């Protein structure tokens, strides 16, 4: 049975190393991590910052999504994921996920599935602010 060691929606900085340490397991032959970073350009425009807002149910939705992916996994020891909300600057992590598994294929596959599931179904909204003074909402679910 796969352990869910973190499923957090937070306004505090998140770090891959912390998630990797959480999922570390003596029986795991692989740990795979993912960091979704705030980049400095989008659509050819310079990005100043992003602001993530979330539906009131988002923390529970995230917990449910991580548990769902964990339950579907095979050969996976532990998973952890966190998503930021609030104001994020270029270079900060918006989404962090880590998976410990018996073998690399399960670790890579489960981590990719976890990230894609969160991106597709978590009710968060991204508001981008650009260097040219414009802004836009992106990726509403």
Swiss-Prot record:
GO function term, MF aspect, one: molybdopterin synthase activity
Catalytic reactions on record: 2 [molybdopterin-synthase sulfur-carrier protein]-C-terminal-Gly-aminoethanethioate + cyclic pyranopterin phosphate + H2O = molybdopterin + 2 [molybdopterin-synthase sulfur-carrier protein]-C-terminal Gly-Gly + 2 H(+)
Keyword Transferase: yes
Name of the protein in question: Molybdopterin synthase catalytic subunit 2
Domain of life assignment: Bacteria
Gene source species: Mycobacterium tuberculosis (strain ATCC 25618 / H37Rv)
Purpose: Converts molybdopterin precursor Z into molybdopterin. This requires the incorporation of two sulfur atoms into precursor Z to generate a dithiolene group. The sulfur is provided by MoaD.
Entry EC number(s): 2.8.1.12
Single GO BP term: Mo-molybdopterin cofactor biosynthetic process
Residues the record lists as binding substrate: 37-39, 103-104, 119, 126-128
Subunit text: Heterotetramer of 2 MoaD subunits and 2 MoaE subunits. Also stable as homodimer. The enzyme changes between these two forms during catalysis.
UniProt keyword annotations, A-Z: Molybdenum cofactor biosynthesis, Transferase
Similarity field: Belongs to the MoaE family.
Name of the coding gene: moaE2
Enzyme class, first EC level, given as a word: transferase
GO annotation, cellular component aspect: cytosol
Pathway info: Cofactor biosynthesis; molybdopterin biosynthesis
Signal is among the record's keywords: no
